[in-house]
């Protein structure tokens, strides 16, 4: 099951490539769009980490059965971790692609200057530039404040499933140190971080996809055997 990133959708390069790969391996595969993303309805401004987590859990509960391998990209890595904690009996393995746990606090709020924080607190919304979209992205106070209910990197993360993290060392959006911090917080599980020296945030190049496919096949083989 593939979980996209913030402002991404189920028709991105990684999602569609992974769908094709899983077909060739006869792996069941599911991808979806969060509320306010892609083909799903809703105002993006009303979205929060909790709401998007609820979307993921609804998909797990209503549309899947048996053991699950979650593959989360960027914010999807955060959602995947939260889903694994909420459904430990279902999630048997997890792969994070440039995972971004706590990004609303560390990479949004933590990077705002005093004037920007004041504007967000007063207006409830801030327009942020994006390297991937022509228009500015609306960042809401609700996104930041609700995100604080789901922070993971402030304490131990007790997962029972194996975790594999892939992160580019040239990632300009989510520093690769985030995956190293995540590794330190994971307890009770086997976790591996693979750093890609020249990798960016998206990790959508052919060589990146090959690395992802290998990780998926290895994880799937473990809990299918």
Give the positions of each predicted feature.
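The alpha/beta-hydrolase serine catalytic core
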Residues: 69, 90-196, 200-225
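Conserved alpha/beta-hydrolase
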Residues: 19-41
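Active-site loop->helix "elbow" adjoining a glycine-rich segment at hydrolase catalytic centers
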Residues: 74-77, 99
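Short glycine-enriched nucleophile-adjacent loop
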Residues: 77-88, 94
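The serine-hydrolase catalytic nucleophile loop
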Residues: 7-19, 177
């Amino acid at each position: 099951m593939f979980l996209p990133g913030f402002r991404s959708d189920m028709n991105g390069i990684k999602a569609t490539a992974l769908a094709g790969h899983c077909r060739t391996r006869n792996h069941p595969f599911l991808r979806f769009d969060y509320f306010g993303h892609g083909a799903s309805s809703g105002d993006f401004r009303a979205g929060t980490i909790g709401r998007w987590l609820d979307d993921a859990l609804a998909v797990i509960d209503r549309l899947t059965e048996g053991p699950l391998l979650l593959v989360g990209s960027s914010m999807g890595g955060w959602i995947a971790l939260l889903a694994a904690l909420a459904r430990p009996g279902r999630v048997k393995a997890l792969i994070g692609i440039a995972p971004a746990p706590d990004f609303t606090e560390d990479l949004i709020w933590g990077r705002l200057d005093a004037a920007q924080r004041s504007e967000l607190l007063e207006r409830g919304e801030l327009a942020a530039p994006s390297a991937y979209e022509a228009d500015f992205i609306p960042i809401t106070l609700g996104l930041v404040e609700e995100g604080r209910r789901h922070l993971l990197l402030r304490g131990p993360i007790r997962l029972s499933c194996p975790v594999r993290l892939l992160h580019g060392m040239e990632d300009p959006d989510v520093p690769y140190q985030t995956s190293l911090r995540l590794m330190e917080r994971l307890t009770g599980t086997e976790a591996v971080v693979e750093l890609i020296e020249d990798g960016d945030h998206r990790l959508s190049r052919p060589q990146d996809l090959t690395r992802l496919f290998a990780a998926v096949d290895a994880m799937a083989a473990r809990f299918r055997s």
